[in-house]
Amino acid sequence: MAVTCDPEAFLSICFVTLVFLQLPLASIWKADFDVTGPHAPILAMAGGHVELQCQLFPNISAEDMELRWYRCQPSLAVHMHERGMDMDGEQKWQYRGRTTFMSDHVARGKAMVRSHRVTTFDNRTYCCRFKDGVKFGEATVQVQVAGLGREPRIQVTDQQDGVRAECTSAGCFPKSWVERRDFRGQARPAVTNLSASATTRLWAVASSLTLWDRAVEGLSCSISSPLLPERRKVAESHLPATFSRSSQFTAWKAALPLILVAMGLVIAGGICIFWKRQREKNKASLEEERE
């Protein structure tokens, strides 16, 4: 039995196939939603926690979607969540045991991962992906880590002609600002060295100055972060009494040559006057004897 083909049906099939081939492949995978992240970087304190939050638009439920947070460069999984369950298989060891999925608002299209015990290595850009079948949307979340470190300490040591004050601190991130002032509020120039740990990337600070001004009663050391300009840690130190005594001794040492020169001039002048008067007396005596 011969199979016949309706020419009109064949043309219809060809037309539909042609239209389908004309469609961009990207439109097949394009999601019916957008994913948005924070508009500004998120500030996280070293040792604290940070929340990586992303939002669906429109506000549809994400309960049945695959949700993934990962480091954009390179692509390392921070946390994965799918259909109400955490998927730990692809999570990198750096994040195991310190991420928590917050499911409070997933039904309204808002999802968040909380990362605990923040370190300097969390200072980077992250990506969040919401995937529904073969369709997905992505957004980025930038995290900036800040740390003021330990309280600064000032160590004062006597020098031959002054005093040396060194301010030290550790655990700062990123590079900190160091400011040295005296108790009158006057800035004091100092030599500051900053060094970063190869293992923690935290910065250590050592700022030293030598003070020659005997009128200064004490010094302060202020450390602040460029990410937290309104917050700072300050240490103050009164100069020891030995510095004032050594300062007085140094002042006497500086004045002693002048005093000796002045005394020498006075003595020399006195001797000159004495010999001049003695000569005049001797001359007068000789003239009287001649008369």
Curated annotation (Swiss-Prot):
Keyword Amino-acid biosynthesis: no
GO cellular component term of the entry, any: external side of plasma membrane
Glycosylation sites: N59
Disulphide-bridged cysteine pairs: C54-C128
InterPro entries: BTN3A2-like_Ig-C (IPR053896), Ig-like_dom (IPR007110), Ig-like_dom_sf (IPR036179), Ig-like_fold (IPR013783), Ig_V-set (IPR013106), IgSF_BTN/MOG (IPR050504)
Membrane topology: Single-pass type I membrane protein
Keyword Glycoprotein tagged: yes
Localization annotation: Membrane
Annotated source species: Homo sapiens (Human)
Domain Ig-like V-type: 27-146
One Gene Ontology biological process: regulation of cytokine production
Family membership noted in the UniProt record: Belongs to the immunoglobulin superfamily. BTN/MOG family.
Cytoplasmic topological segments: 276-291
Keywords tagged on the record: Disulfide bond, Glycoprotein, Immunoglobulin domain, Membrane, Signal, Transmembrane, Transmembrane helix
Membrane-side (Extracellular) residue stretches: 27-254
Gene Ontology molecular functions: signaling receptor binding
Transmembrane segments: 255-275
Name of the protein described by the UniProt record: Putative butyrophilin-like protein 10 pseudogene
Leader sequence segment: 1-26
A matching Pfam family: V-set
